[in-house]
């Protein structure tokens, strides 16, 4: 039977054309750790301590570490064998992996503070304005919102989290309403669910009141929390954050001196588009975390991590002297 082509439809200047890519069967075998090391050595990677490399590959995995080898390989157009740039050492790959891990953890630390703040601000406004069980009233949502679906989700989460002490207390002590007050409800929703609730379903006047706390307009705030949820999921699943092109571009505020990063963003590699890289998200995180905690030192910890490493800032969409921008409030 002939191999069926995979059809891709592209739009070009108002016309559509079809490109056929021939699909093939995956035939690569699984490799032992020793074979993985041998393959990298064959491609030119220096292994000063194979036993050390073996230990890391056993607990991190060849596939995960492979993503960190790409910057150290000869450019793809001239390199079908994934050959390493001469002089590349396994320690280079490992150090980049460790740096990326530290960066992810630093990002998660800030997002956790922002997320807790967002939960609290949403609950405080909605509960004080419409009552503790505001989310049970369909009138508090836009007409297009599937209110029944929200209640089904909360009901499902109550079953899943029934061993939580605060859920047990409510269900044992109260029979009406069936659902707990919103300060409990917002704690059992995931950040993604809470983001969807706020961004798509609350009335505009409520979105405006919630975003006022963070000193930005609702469209920008709602775009930012969606972007934070996106990058949070990347970090929480231990995926690479350095040298990543972001799938979701956040909406940008009007530039006001020292309250937002300077434009245009200029990086050392002209092929890189900063708007789709991490730097914008780091700026968003820094802005929001300082609304939650005015005395936060998160930006200083970011400075220490970035400036004590040797890895490309351009691959994060970051200017070489990013810290000189007044937005970062760094000496």
Predicted regions located by residue number:
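Long, contiguous internal "core" modules enriched in hydrophobic/ aromatic residues
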Residues: 3-331
């Amino acid at each position: 039977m002939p191999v069926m082509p995979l059809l891709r439809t592209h739009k070009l200047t108002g016309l559509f054309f079809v490109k056929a890519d021939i699909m093939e069967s995956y035939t690569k075998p699984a490799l032992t750790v020793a074979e993985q090391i041998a393959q990298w050595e064959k491609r030119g990677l220096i292994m000063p301590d194979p036993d050390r490399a073996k230990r890391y590959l056993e607990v991190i995995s060849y596939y995960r570490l492979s993503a960190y080898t790409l910057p150290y390989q000869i450019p793809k157009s001239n390199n079908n064998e994934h050959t390493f740039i001469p002089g590349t050492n396994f320690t280079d790959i490992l150090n980049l992996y460790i740096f990326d891990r530290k960066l992810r953890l630093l990002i998660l630390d800030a997002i956790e503070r922002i997320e807790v703040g967002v939960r609290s601000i949403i609950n405080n406004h909605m509960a004080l304005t419409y009552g503790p069980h505001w989310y049970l009233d369909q009138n508090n949502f836009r007409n297009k919102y599937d209110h029944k679906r929200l209640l089904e989700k909360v009901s499902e989460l109550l079953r899943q989290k029934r061993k939580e002490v605060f859920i047990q207390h409510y269900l044992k002590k109260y029979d009406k309403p069936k659902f707990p007050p919103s300060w409990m409800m917002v704690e059992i929703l995931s950040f993604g669910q809470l983001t969807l609730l706020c961004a798509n379903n609350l009335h505009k006047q409520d979105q405006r009141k919630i975003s006022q706390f963070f000193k930005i307009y609702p469209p920008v705030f709602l775009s930012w929390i969606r972007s934070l949820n996106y990058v949070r999921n990347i970090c929480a699943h231990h995926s690479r954050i350095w040298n990543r092109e972001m799938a979701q571009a956040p909406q940008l505020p009007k530039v006001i001196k020292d309250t937002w990063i300077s434009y245009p963003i200029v990086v050392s590699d002209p092929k890189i588009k900063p708007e789709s890289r991490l730097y914008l998200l780091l700026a968003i995180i820094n802005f929001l975390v300082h609304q939650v905690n005015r005395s936060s030192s998160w930006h200083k910890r970011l400075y220490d991590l970035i400036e004590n490493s040797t890895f490309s800032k351009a691959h994060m969409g970051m200017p070489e002297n990013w810290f000189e921008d007044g937005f970062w409030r760094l000496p």
